[in-house]
Regions:
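Short N-terminal targeting/anchoring amphipathic segment
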Residues: 92-114
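A nucleotide-sugar donor-handling region in carbohydrate enzymes
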Residues: 36-38, 42-43, 156-224
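A short, histidine- and acid-enriched strand-loop-helix "catalytic/donor-clamping" loop
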Residues: 132-147
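Leloir-type glycosyltransferase catalytic cores
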Residues: 326-370
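A donor-sugar binding/catalytic signature common to diverse glycosyltransferases
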Residues: 109-110, 117-121, 134, 163, ...
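Donor-nucleotide binding loops and adjacent catalytic segments primarily
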Residues: 41-43, 48, 199-286
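Conserved nucleotide-sugar phosphate-binding/catalytic loop shared by glycosyltransferases and other
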Residues: 31-86, 90
Length: 370
């Protein structure tokens, strides 16, 4: 048996986290999948890979020594051109890697980042491989909300050959798609969560009870008044129980530009740097509630039964909405309503019910890929 037939084209730490259970499932069958990395995000990539017991990327489609990650939309065209140019220049090498064991070549992409459609195009058009999309079929119903994620998903759906959809709703969204559509019953995030949920957590300096917030999407932070409104509501709420706001460098720069640093203190509304997944999830699981604009974190809250407000206008995952996970439509009054009622919103824990990565790996095995 050769070393590999499957390559993941990925670009963010979130993608690495969510494909980790699939990667390990394939490896358990005697193959060693490859990771080709677009460097859409590079912060803490090496640490995240080490946390997940995964190797360094086999190929950097943006040279590692010059990679700096995407921080603004204006950087996307140059990044995309670099990725495409390197994939084209190395096409013979990449094709050889995909076919070295004689099985059908396969590229896997994930989710809805810029890397998702670009990886699909590289796999299909440049490398002439079959392409599978993990977490396929999510739709918000609006190209503009969220932008660019909704567009990325739709482009990928037109290219790929296999769609691994996390629920019957996404399967239905793909009813006219070409290729194979597989219902994995849940997001692979639930499998990644099992790798992290019981890990150690540093609670030193934190209050016994706290809420936790992460707000980072372009559609929110680019709209100064909406971002200000959300942070002011959280600041006011933190006087009742402290709130920990996990902010990356772009959010901190935006807070500074809007003159909002004075909202935060070290007692009630506490700002902290983002944590790696294996450190963040155990912390989040101990929060009383979550306020986020992350679809992935909202799904994790659903699986944990942890009260969560999704501060977005629309969501591509309405199947997670209900008493536990609430969509605010980016309205301040709805966010406040959640904060007033979160104590009654704790739901059922689904952690042991779903195993989507097993379904994906078994499907790939049945199709002769592993």
């Amino acid at each position: 048996m050769g070393l590999t037939v499957i390559s993941f084209i990925l670009g963010t730490t979130a993608e690495l986290i969510k494909i980790a259970p699939v990667y390990h499932g394939i490896a358990e069958r005697g193959l060693r999948p490859k990771i080709w990395f677009t460097a859409q995000h590079i912060g803490e990539v090496a640490d995240v890979l080490a946390d997940l017991n995964m190797p360094e990327p086999d190929v950097w489609l943006v040279p590692k020594e010059t990679a700096h990650g995407l921080e603004t939309p204006a950087q996307v065209p140059g990044w995309a051109a670099t990725v495409a140019r390197n994939a084209w220049n190395r096409r013979a090498e990449l094709r050889a890697a995909l076919t070295e064991d004689g099985r059908p070549p396969l590229v896997l992409v994930h989710g809805d980042t810029f890397t998702t459609p670009y990886g699909s195009l590289i796999g299909k058009r440049i490398l002439k491989a079959r392409v599978g999309h993990i977490e396929a079929g999510a739709r918000s119903g609006s190209i503009l909300s969220p932008l660019p994620e909704e567009l990325n998903r739709k482009i990928a759906a037109k290219i790929v050959d296999m769609h691994f959809a996390p629920s019957a709703r996404e399967v239905n969204n793909l009813r006219n798609a070409r290729g194979v559509v597989v219902d994995t019953e849940a997001n692979t995030a639930i499998d990644a969560m099992r790798l992290a949920i019981d890990g150690p957590v540093d609670l030193s300096g934190l209050p016994e009870k706290f809420g936790l917030a992460t707000l980072h999407r372009f559609e929110l932070v680019s709209r100064g008044e909406k971002y200000r409104e959300a942070l002011e509501i959280l600041r006011d709420q933190s006087r009742q129980m402290p709130i920990l706001y996990m902010a990356g460098a772009p959010e901190r720069e935006r807070i500074k530009a809007l003159g909002l640093e004075n909202l935060f203190d070290e007692k009630n509304f506490i700002i902290r740097p983002k944590l790696r997944y294996l450190k963040f999830l155990p912390l989040a699981a101990r929060a009383e509630y979550i306020v986020t604009d992350s679809g992935g974190l909202a799904a994790e809250c659903f699986y944990l039964g942890l009260p969560c407000a999704v501060h977005r206008e629309r969501t591509e995952s309405p199947q997670h909405l209900g008493e536990t996970v609430m969509l605010t439509e980016m309205r301040g009054d709805k966010l406040q309503n959640f904060l007033d009622t979160y104590q009654s919103r704790r739901g059922e824990n689904w952690m042991e019910k779903y195993h989507p990565s097993d379904i994906i790996v078994k499907t790939l095995a049945q199709l002769g890929y592993c």
